[in-house]
Amino acid sequence: MLDAQTIATVKATIPLLVETGPKLTAHFYDRMFTHNPELKEIFNMSNQRNGDQREALFNAIAAYASNIENLPALLPAVEKIAQKHTSFQIKPEQYNIVGEHLLATLDEMFSPGQEVLDAWGKAYGVLANVFINREAEIYNENASKAGGWEGTRDFRIVAKTPRSALITSFELEPVDGGAVAEYRPGQYLGVWLKPEGFPHQEIRQYSLTRKPDGKGYRIAVKREEGGQVSNWLHNHANVGDVVKLVAPAGDFFMAVADDTPVTLISAGVGQTPMLAMLDTLAKAGHTAQVNWFHAAENGDVHAFADEVKELGLSLPRFTAHTWYRQPNEADRAKGQFDSEGLMDLSKLEGAFSDPTMQFYLCGPVGFMQFAAKQLVDLGVKQENIHYECFGPHKVL
């Protein structure tokens, strides 16, 4: 526990943190990667280049300072970050490195004096221990469950299937021939790659796209413009190649009773975790209402349409609606979308009038903000809306 003086000292630095903004974390990362370049093998350097990770870390530091006397308020954020950390295989000793550079950054940017540095040192130590302990629990859970493992495990690509102009699915089975750990629908795999020509090892998280079967995993990858890893997977990864995987993780998952109605809302590649949820509901014979609402640019980039249709046929109460923002002539001829333009949920209000319905959202942040606002305006409670950001977390 932190004493009152330490808490007061840390909270007194909040205005300075807010004024400085992500410049603080930019300095921190530049310093850390200069002194500890080996950490480039762990961090997603693409998120470093576009600034997303710097913004996310700054928001986390500011949130911690603001809630330092109320740590339970931070537990949902801690769980999200701890789950992600396990896919990077973060170890306790790396927290010492981060703490060293955080304090050095505060000193170099602000020269706040030893009292402030000592207070932040204590505060960081408390937070680091929260993460270390939770991550140890997750590592132990992953290693002890049936088909689970520690660290990375070699998997072979057994199928590679283009699903649209931008999305390709990969089916993976363990090289050792053993069983694989089950997961909750909505969770992701940690994929570790360092092909020839890559300056650093790259680690990515890709959502699992079907119900667990104990034999292997399926992920789907969108080709991102300029994306080093996604383009390598699309262009160079082949059936028979071996990649390293970390056990499934993630705090975004579906957990509902048989009589709970569910709405799955997605845009683009955001449908990937929703596919695992829909597959799980279909194979469980879910009796309550299930809605599938999806937005895509057009039919060329709309993946898994046939699979969704087939799964929906096995559900007794299923409604699907697809929006194409800019349908092409082939889309119009085939009639494979329901509405043109942006997703407008107000026209489907009757499909989710049940107050117990749970809503799961995934897609670009702007899309999720747009969809969540519509839901709230239609009377949906915030606690019934669950969402996942690909990349560093952002609040809707």
Curated annotation (Swiss-Prot):
Listed GO MF terms: FAD binding; heme binding; metal ion binding; nitric oxide dioxygenase NAD(P)H activity; oxygen binding; oxygen carrier activity
Sequence positions that bind NADP(+): G268, V269, G270, Q271, T272, P273
Catalysis: reaction(s): 2 nitric oxide + NADPH + 2 O2 = 2 nitrate + NADP(+) + H(+); 2 nitric oxide + NADH + 2 O2 = 2 nitrate + NAD(+) + H(+)
PROSITE patterns (UniProt xref): FAD_FR (PS51384), GLOBIN (PS01033)
Protein's GO biological process: cellular response to nitrosative stress; nitric oxide catabolic process; response to toxic substance
Site (Involved in heme-bound ligand stabilization and O-O bond activation): Y29
Pfam families associated with the record: FAD_binding_6, Globin, NAD_binding_1
UniProt: FAD binding residues: Y188, R204, Q205, Y206, S207, C389, F390, G391, P392
Positions marked as site (Influences the redox potential of the prosthetic heme and FAD groups): K84, E388
Region (Reductase) location: 147-396
EC number(s) from the headed UniProt entry: 1.14.12.17
Domain FAD-binding FR-type positions: 150-255
Active site: Y95 (charge relay system), E135 (charge relay system)
Domain of life according to the entry: Bacteria
Keyword annotations from UniProtKB, A to Z: Detoxification, FAD, Flavoprotein, Heme, Iron, Metal-binding, NAD, NADP, Oxidoreductase, Oxygen transport, Transport
Cofactor(s) of this protein: heme b; FAD
UniProt-annotated binding residues for heme b: H85
Every Globin domain range: 1-136
This protein's domain notes: Consists of two distinct domains; an N-terminal heme-containing oxygen-binding domain and a C-terminal reductase domain with binding sites for FAD and NAD(P)H.
Function field: Is involved in NO detoxification in an aerobic process, termed nitric oxide dioxygenase (NOD) reaction that utilizes O(2) and NAD(P)H to convert NO to nitrate, which protects the bacterium from various noxious nitrogen compounds. Therefore, plays a central role in the inducible response to nitrosative stress.
HAMAP family, per the entry: Hmp
Similarity comment: Belongs to the globin family. Two-domain flavohemoproteins subfamily. In the C-terminal section; belongs to the flavoprotein pyridine nucleotide cytochrome reductase family.
Name of the protein this chain belongs to: Flavohemoprotein
Organism of provenance: Escherichia coli O6:H1 (strain CFT073 / ATCC 700928 / UPEC)
Gene field: hmp
